[in-house]
UniProtKB/Swiss-Prot annotation:
Catalytic activity of the protein: cyanate + hydrogencarbonate + 3 H(+) = NH4(+) + 2 CO2
HAMAP family assigned to the protein according to its UniProt record, in alphabetical order: Cyanate_hydrat
Gene (UniProt): cyn1
Keyword terms: Lyase
Protein name: Cyanate hydratase
EC number in record: 4.2.1.104
Amino acid sequence: MSLATLDTTEHPNLPTVSTTLFKAKAARKLSFEKIGEHIGRNEVAAAAIFYGQAKPSREDIEKLADLLHIPQQPLEEQLNGFPDRGRSVEMPPKEPLIYRLYEIVQNYGYAYKAVLNEKFGDGIMSAISFSTKVEKETDEDGNNWAVITLRGKWLPFSRF
């Protein structure tokens, strides 16, 4: 099994704790799926903590420290603040997989918007009251397919 690692030269805007977390993850040979299971969160949520894009609870930090064999106190100090979301990726992204996700929004963004507006009315899908998951499907020909589910609360625009 291949594991996601971190090249800090590719990610200069990540918090310093990201390096600590990724080094420990590699040393323990853990996937984000296993880390998520251990802390009781989705694998994408676990990865978002490592990239500084999600705020872990105190319990998450305790469980991460235990699993990754990292002293809890410095980990708490480094993860205690609020995430600076959205700064970790330059736009447009250069990394091919992230660029493909960006390209999906470029190509289908207005189509998604039109269909969502027709189904829900004038509003937006929350990225705060939100969950996501990644699944792998294999078709009858043996081809692998990535299935990404985005689930966000619908927030209607207020009339004023």
